[in-house]
Amino acid sequence: MGIEMAMVRPPRCLLVNVTTGESMECLFNPTQLTEKVQVNYSRLAVPGLSHQVLQFQSTGNRQLSGVEFYLDRFFATEQPGEPDILDFHAFLRALTVPPEGTEGVVDTAPPRTLLIWPDVITVETVVTDVEFQYRQVAVDGTVLVYAATVTFEEILDARVTSEALREEV
């Protein structure tokens, strides 16, 4: 591997609002990713038995918790197009509320989010939690550096089997 490879920008994580088609590329890729799946069992107490019988109920949705997106105004000004770091803030906030003009229980949910991180993960989710931490603010109140910590939960529209998961790469 030559020095030219050191200058190649790695693929960036991308978030897509499935409802509007709007997408936002991450300024930096998250430094870590925690994936959690919960398996739910009913605990059946049988009189006289020394233990509880576990009966499978369901598998919970895959969760990606505490995904941290770091945004730095100084770094952003050096990028093509000089992205405004607060646009990412507005994009994430828009993923937490229903879109305008929706009516009815089914439609009045926040939009789904497609999380695409090349060679790592691609998953359709909803945002279940967002926390913004403003780490550096200028004297005039301009946000210079902040982190957005997001929890995503996978949305599945079809039954998943263990065989199908074994085939995923």
Language-model features, listed with the residues they occupy:
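Acidic, Ser/Thr- and Gly-enriched intrinsically disordered low-complexity segments
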Residues: M1-V169
